UniProtKB/Swiss-Prot annotation:
Organism: Picosynechococcus sp. (strain ATCC 27264 / PCC 7002 / PR-6) (Agmenellum quadruplicatum)
Designated name of the protein: Ribosome-recycling factor
Pfam families noted in UniProt: RRF
Alphabetical list of Gene3D superfamilies matching this protein: 3.30.1360.40, Ribosome-recycling factor (1.10.132.20)
Gene that encodes the chain: frr
A cellular component term, taken from the record's GO annotations: cytoplasm
Entry similarity comment: Belongs to the RRF family.
General function of this protein: Responsible for the release of ribosomes from messenger RNA at the termination of protein biosynthesis. May increase the efficiency of translation by recycling ribosomes from one round of translation to another.
Length: 182
C-alpha cells in the first residue's frame, strides 16, 4: 500500500466520521438531521430525502414536503419512530418539525455519542494502519525491501495515522462545542 493510498483511505474515514457527526442534533434545525431516516414506502425502505423536499425556514423548524401526498403518513410514522425525539406536525401537505432547545442532560448524551463516533473513526484509522504495516512487513519478508526501508515506511505510516487521528480529535472538539452552545 502506497502512502498516497493510505492517505486517501484515511481521508475517507475522516469524511465518514464527519457525516456521522452531522446526523447528531444540535440546537439548530438542519436537514442533515434526517439523513439516517428511512421510510417504508410501498414495502421498501427508502431514504426520506428521496421522497421529499427538506428545508429549514428558520433556525428551529424543519419543513418536509413529500413529493407524493400519499406518503405523508409514512413519513410522519418514520420520524416518530426514529431516535431523534421529535414530534412531527402534519398539516395535510407538509410536515413541520419544531426543534426544541436541548436540555443539559440531552446535550451531555450527545457529547458522549459524538465521542463514541470519534472512537469508531479512530478504530477505522488503526485498522487501515495495521493493514498498511502488514503489507510492509510482507514486502520485507519477501525481500522486496530492506529492513531499514521497512522501518522507515512503518514510521511514515505511523506519522500519517497520528495526523489523521488529530484531525478526528479536532472534529470532535468542534462538534462538542457546537452541541454545548446554548
Amino acid at each position: 500500500m502506497q502512502l498516497s493510498e493510505l492517505r486517501e483511505n484515511m481521508q475517507k474515514t475522516i469524511e465518514a466520521t464527519q457525516r456521522s457527526f452531522n446526523t447528531l442534533r444540535t440546537g439548530r434545525a438542519s436537514a442533515s438531521l434526517l439523513d439516517r431516516i428511512t421510510v417504508e414506502y410501498y414495502g421498501a425502505e427508502t431514504p426520506l430525502k428521496s421522497l421529499a423536499s427538506i428545508s429549514t425556514p428558520d433556525s428551529s423548524t424543519i419543513m418536509i414536503q413529500p413529493f407524493d401526498r400519499g406518503s405523508l403518513s409514512d413519513v410522519e410514522r418514520a420520524i416518530s419512530m426514529s431516535d431523534l425525539g421529535l414530534t412531527p406536525n402534519n398539516d395535510g401537505t407538509n410536515i413541520r418539525l419544531n426543534i426544541p432547545p436541548l436540555t443539559k442532560e440531552r446535550r451531555q448524551e450527545l457529547v458522549k455519542t459524538a465521542g463514541k463516533l470519534a472512537e469508531e473513526g479512530k478504530v477505522a484509522l488503526r485498522n487501515i494502519r495495521r493493514d498498511a504495516i502488514d503489507d510492509v512487513r510482507k514486502q520485507e519478508k519477501n525481500s522486496d525491501i530492506s529492513e531499514d526501508e521497512s522501518r522507515s515506511l512503518q514510521d511514515d505510516i505511523q506519522k500519517v495515522t497520528d495526523e489523521f487521528t488529530t484531525k478526528i480529535d479536532d472534529l470532535l472538539k468542534i462538534k462538542e462545542k457546537d452541541i454545548m452552545t446554548v
